[in-house]
C-alpha cells in the first residue's frame, strides 16, 4: 500500500498509524536523540508533549523520512505541540562523560526545558537514567510506535542537521552538510588528510577505516 499526503512524498508499506499515548489521563513526553554514532558535532535530544488527540499520516521514525519531509514535519510538530524542547551536549562533553551518558544528559536538558512538566516519559531505546522523580518507560524502536517519540526524533534530527550545516561553513573539507558528522568513507578520508577539528570527538575511533561505529 502507498499512502499519499498533500505536500509530502509517498511512503510505501505504511501499514499502521502510530499510537497517540501510552496512558490517556496523564501528561506524557516523548524523548529521542540524534547524532549518537557521529564522529563530529554534538548529540542532540528532544522532548515533546503532544495533544492526546494528535494524529498524523506521515510522522514516523525520522530515519524513515526524507530531509524534505522532516523539514515540513518540524514546523508542524512545533505548531501542534503543547510543549517541546531540544537539548545539546557538545563533543567536548561527550569525550568527558561517554556517549551514552551524554545522550541521556541531552534528554534531561530537553525535559527540563519543557514549559509543561510531564508526569511520564516515553524514551526511545533501552537505556535511561531517571529524571528527578518522573516515571519513565524505555521502548526499543519507540520512534516507530508512538507519535510523541517520533516527533522528538524529527526535532532532534532536524535541529542537529541544521547545526552541522552551520559549522560545515567553517570546515567545508569534511562535507558535514552531507554526512552530518557520521563516519562515512569521505569523512574519514578528510580526517586522515586534514586532521581533526575542534568539533571532532576525540574519544571516538576517528582514524579507523571502518565505515560505521556500533554501540
Language-model-detected regions and their locations in the chain:
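RNase H-like, Mg2+-dependent phosphodiesterase core
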Residues: 12-215
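N-terminal amphipathic/basic-hydrophobic helices that include classical n-h-c signal peptides
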Residues: 1-16
